[in-house]
Design a protein with these regions (language model features):
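Short, structured segments at the rim of ligand-binding sites
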Residues: 1-370
Length: 370
């Protein structure tokens, strides 16, 4: 898709079923390296998923995609597994580095290309490697690859992450899944996607518990076969649609969700004057004319997600008065601001904070997506 042509002033209404979460599906797909046979349902059929499937096929897994059912079937029966993730399959998908943990755990070695750059900021893998070294892996960086080895297997450890990282938490959990002994991970990411990965691993035979920001892992003794797992809904997709509904909706109903996983977003929209009704598995949003100003800061879950920062900023342009949003996760996530200003938004950036003066009447313009 090279361009989208959008004709404005269209009032939206209807029902939307939310897709499965890409950010949950990717680490779970990587986790199937630890399994014998698994079926994953509610899979979103997006580019990163297909890239991860190609990577797993390259490694040696047998995979069948049932597109109409949004289901992927995985068989891990190949004895000649490659413990390599080449650059061509990792450069466009940062989640490729998540095969590092399960390859080390099951096959005691891995050679993984360093991920490519990211437009929204630097996202180093140093915390991934920090955790794996604590578990006993020998790691070196050579010719653009992470070369890791654990000849005698990984051993449980007490790991204190210096900062919260979703990817590093996931890789550490995957690596420690069948490590010898107990592992304690402190200062972990506890996003719903991380919890969904742990739910899959526990179905597989894992013994993993979450207590606050601590994850306790007792090395798995026996893998269960023929497991089925339904991936959770995409809370970022839902949040995006909710904001769109607040902007141009008449009445929109969202299905296939768990409202308690997006309570922060619901609270923010209510504070901004958005009319909505949240139930356990559905949310209704009604036409909202009097949008109120608000000050926000992006934070790790359960705080306001950085992945909805750009979307909520559009809603802020409709608010009466000055709204502010601080980006505390990434250092380069205001690339959408010049494009919104082209459409008529009044936005100023000071350090890590965007100051939005509203209300602004946005008009159609040619803009660039990032």
């Amino acid at each position: 898709m090279k361009k989208l042509l959008i004709n404005g002033k269209k009032e939206l209404s209807g029902k939307i079923s939310i897709s499965g979460s890409k950010n949950a599906a990717l680490p779970i797909l990587a986790a199937t390296i630890l399994s014998d046979k698994a079926k994953l349902t509610n899979i979103p059929l997006v580019k990163d998923i297909f890239t991860m499937v190609e990577l797993l096929k390259f490694i040696g897994l047998k995979i069948n995609i049932l597109k109409k059912k949004h289901t992927i079937e995985i068989r891990n029966i190949n004895k000649n597994i490659k413990t390599l993730a080449p650059y061509k399959l990792v450069k466009t998908m940062r989640a490729g580095v998540l095969v590092l943990g399960p390859l080390l755990a099951k096959h005691k070695k891995a050679k993984i290309s360093l991920p490519g750059g990211c437009a929204i900021g630097t996202r180093p893998v140093n915390l991934h490697l920090f955790a794996l070294k604590k578990l006993g892996a020998k790691i070196k960086i050579k010719n653009g690859y992470i070369v890791a080895e654990a000849k005698n297997g990984l051993k449980g450890a007490n790991i204190d992450f210096p900062s919260i990282s979703v990817g590093a938490t996931e890789n550490a959990v995957l690596a420690a899944f069948n490590a010898n002994g107990k592992t304690i991970l402190n200062n972990c990411a506890t996003e719903p996607e991380v919890k969904d990965l742990i739910k899959f691993l526990n179905t597989l035979g894992g013994r993993i518990k979450i207590v606050g920001r601590k994850i306790l892992i007792d090395g798995c003794k026996k893998i269960k076969k023929n497991i089925i797992h339904e991936v959770i809904f995409d809370r970022i997709e839902l949040g995006t649609y909710m904001i769109a509904a607040a902007l141009v909706g008449k009445k929109i109903i969202f299905n296939k969700i768990d409202s308690k996983l997006i309570q922060n977003e619901i609270d923010v929209l209510k504070k901004m004057g958005v009319k909505l009704k949240a139930q356990k598995s559905t949310i209704e949003i009604f036409k909202s004319n009097n949008i109120k100003k608000i000050n926000l800061s992006t934070k790790p879950y359960p705080g306001f997600p950085t992945d909805l920062q750009a979307q909520i900023m559009v809603l802020m342009t409709r608010a009466q008065g000055i709204s502010k949003i601080k980006e505390s996760i990434f250092e380069n996530r205001f690339m959408h601001v010049p494009e919104l200003k082209r459409m008529g938004a009044d936005i100023e950036i000071k350090n890590k904070t965007a100051i939005i003066k509203g209300p602004s009447k946005l008009t159609g313009a040619e803009v660039m997506a990032t």
